[in-house]
């Protein structure tokens, strides 16, 4: 089951603590007014270790652990079991790992959370990274499907395997939501509020538009973390969501 979402805009925004040292990430998260969710990615996790999840939870925050596990079924199961026991509420796995690995990961995540006395997390299958463009997928990976074909296929594979949601570009959110009603979670990076630079994201959308398209939650990093006034930038993102949430 997906983590419950309150009605407020702040519950829909996950701030990515990317590019920060551990102490900086903890301080930033503690000082951002109204923050509910944070994303811990590979760089921060490798530098800080698993304890960063506990430290953020001690600050009253909910954690999206974005490590994108992609391995054989037994290894993915072991990793998800331990990630769930840390208290992460959202955990990413690669859909390309295949149905056996996804099923093993899902079962292990439930087991790990139960053993730790926690509610089971939602696993999110990564479909196509938002940095990829269609021509590059064809040229570098010899994938002949269009992104519009590949993303729904991977999402369906994941849903059939029991995964509770997926990570997708906001540009694919409407099509996926039509196929997968809530509570299937759609978490979308590639969110760029009005006036923000696109950066290394190839498939982007504004916050209100992404929610209207069917996204459950939005991952926003640099437009907030690199802003002159991060709290004001976060508040502005929340304001942009007003009217987009039922």
UniProtKB/Swiss-Prot annotation:
GO cellular component terms, semicolon-separated: cytosol
Q: What is its EC number?
A: 4.1.1.23
Q: Which residues form a coiled coil?
A: none
- EC category name: lyase
What positions does UniProt annotate as the active site of this protein?
68 (proton donor)
Protein name listed in UniProt: Orotidine 5'-phosphate decarboxylase
Membership in a protein family = Belongs to the OMP decarboxylase family. Type 1 subfamily.
Q: Function, please?
A: Catalyzes the decarboxylation of orotidine 5'-monophosphate (OMP) to uridine 5'-monophosphate (UMP).
InterPro entries, per this entry?
Aldolase_TIM (IPR013785), OMPdecase (IPR014732), OMPdecase_AS (IPR018089), OMPdecase_bac (IPR047596), OMPdeCOase_dom (IPR001754), RibuloseP-bd_barrel (IPR011060)
Species annotation: Parasynechococcus marenigrum (strain WH8102)
Q: Where along this sequence does the record place binding of substrate? A: 18, 39, 66-75, 130, 192, 201, 221-222
């Amino acid at each position: 089951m997906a983590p419950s979402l309150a009605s407020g805009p702040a519950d829909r925004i996950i701030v990515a603590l990317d590019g920060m040292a551990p102490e900086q990430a903890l301080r930033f998260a503690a000082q951002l007014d109204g923050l509910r969710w944070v994303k811990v990615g590979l760089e921060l996790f490798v530098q800080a270790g698993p304890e960063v999840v506990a430290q953020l939870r001690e600050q009253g925050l909910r954690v999206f652990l974005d490590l994108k596990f992609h391995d054989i079924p037994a290894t993915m199961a072991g990793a998800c079991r331990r990630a769930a026991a840390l208290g992460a509420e959202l955990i990413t796995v690669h859909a390309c790992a295949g149905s056996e690995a996804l099923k093993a990961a899902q079962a292990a995540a439930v087991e790990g959370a139960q053993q730790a006395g926690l509610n089971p997390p939602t696993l999110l299958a990564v479909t196509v990274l938002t940095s990829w463009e269609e021509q590059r997928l064809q040229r570098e990976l010899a994938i002949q499907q269009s992104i519009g074909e590949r993303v729904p296929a991977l999402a369906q594979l994941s849903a059939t395997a029991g995964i509770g949601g997926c990570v997708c570009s906001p540009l694919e959110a409407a099509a996926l939501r039509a196929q997968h009603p809530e509570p299937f979670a759609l978490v979308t990076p590639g969110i760029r509020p009005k006036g923000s630079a696109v950066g290394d994201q190839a498939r982007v959308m504004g916050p209100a538009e992404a929610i209207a398209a069917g996204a459950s939650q939005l991952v926003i990093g640099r437009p907030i973390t690199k802003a002159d006034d991060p709290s004001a930038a976060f508040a502005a993102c929340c304001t942009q969501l007003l009217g987009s949430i039922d």
